[in-house]
Amino acid sequence: MRRRLFVVHCGQQEYDRTSGGDFMQGFQKVVGHQEIITHLQNAISMNKVSHAYLFGGESGSGKKMMASLFAMTLQCEKHGVEPCMECASCKKAQNKNHPDIIYVTHEKPNTISIDEIREQLINDVMIKPYSSPYKIYVIDEAQKLTLQAQNALLKTIEEPPAYAVILLLADNPDALLPTILSRCVQLNLKPVGDQLVKDYLMNEMHVPDYQAEVDASLAQGNIGKAERIARSPEYEETLEQALRIVKYVDSMPLHEIMETIKKLTAEKDNIDDYFDIFSLWFRDVLLFKATKEVDALVFKQELNGIRARANKSSYEGLEKIIESIQKARARLNANVNFDLTMELMFLTMKEN
């Protein structure tokens, strides 16, 4: 095994569906990310598996599924580039009880401590595999490793036993030390194309065509988010409420805007979903104003409302509204006052 830096940027899904049924087709079950899959399979077939890999990408992009399939394939008794799903090793891996695939856990929600890394990995890695060619450690949420934990882990990554493979999964790889990054094969899972997401929702989850198109647009290339949207009755309520707001905000008196903000205070955990819907709606309005094309709209069934807003608002006004949504999202991420942030955004929508 060789340690080297190899960065793959793939313009194609974490959907963390790592139960047995989701593995039944191996890598074929993964939506997109073909370049990354090919790289992993080539490493296996050429016997050039590295000691450390870093799977980067936002939550829901597919990191956990990709890493789990890679680990399962490495341990498969058929020694192919896909897990066979039938051997004892694959069955144990599917059931998450494989003795040589270790998932590192942590007690505190926001940190992985040096003691947890020492106990579950550093001390354990010196014990040879129980029944497999590799001993594989999966560290999910690796961005939560403390500085001390990272420094301790670095020594193992630099001088690992020949059989050790460490798979780090991180929403934000930049939170890791440059010295760790430089010693890992970095595989960055980027958003999947909307058509791939739509096809997945229709074929695998039996979502109707129009709804699949809307869900795919709202998911923004994230299969995990697309699944959540398609399965969640609560999201339907969010969608209806958000569309009601954008359709009528221009005629709302100030007291009704303030009442809307009060209701949204209870939805703070889902506020990013509202911002996504607001942005897509006004993008549709701007697109329709410029082209009169209906087929390119996300919310085709809302054509009357989109046409009415397009006739009322100027190009400059629509651009101001879209910018105000982006600013509101950034302000809330920076912990600016919720009510004030939402009021400024809604007033921009109303006045433009």
Each PLM stretch: what is its role?
Residues 151-168:
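Conserved catalytic/switch belt of AAA+ P-loop NTPases
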Residues 16-18, 24-72, 89-92, 162-164, ...:
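Charged, glycine-rich active-site and insertion segments that engage polyanionic ligands
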